[in-house]
Amino acid sequence: MKNIASRLALAATLATTLLSAPIMAQELNGTLKKIKDTGVIALGHRESSIPFSYYDDKQQVIGYSHELMLKVVDAVKADLKLAKLDIKLMPVTSSNRITLVQNGSVDLECGSTTNNTERQKQVSFSN
């Protein structure tokens, strides 16, 4: 469990770095441009993947993965110099999470998705 939490923390840190690096360029493109233009970031979350991402008694998303994504959101907001960045929460499953990232419905998904060669052909991972 400690190893998974450590890997998730590292992934979030690297995701923040990777998402922030293009900001230093003159022109934004891709996901960061979409986020800046719309003022919205879409986070993919699992509904019952305790302790990573799940609903609490009040149907609010909580968990390690969700907290890490919120840290990434804070970094993106600061780097894009946005006064406000709305968060759109989108439930994902093991069956649809890759597709939703590919088609832009989800900007960031942080979970137990295995980083393997086949998936690297489909989406970008942070290590």
Predicted regions and their residues:
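Short, polar/charged alpha-helical segment
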Residues: 29, 56-79
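Bacterial N-terminal signal peptides
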Residues: 9-20
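Short N-terminal segments immediately surrounding and downstream of signal-peptide cleavage
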Residues: 27-39
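Sec-exported extracytoplasmic/periplasmic mature domains
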Residues: 36-40, 73-81, 102, 106
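Sec/Tat signal peptide C-region and signal peptidase I cleavage site
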Residues: 21-25
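Acidic, polar ligand-binding/catalytic clefts
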Residues: 70, 82-127
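Bacterial N-terminal signal peptides that target proteins for export
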Residues: 1-10
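Short glycine-rich His-centered loop
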Residues: 40-64
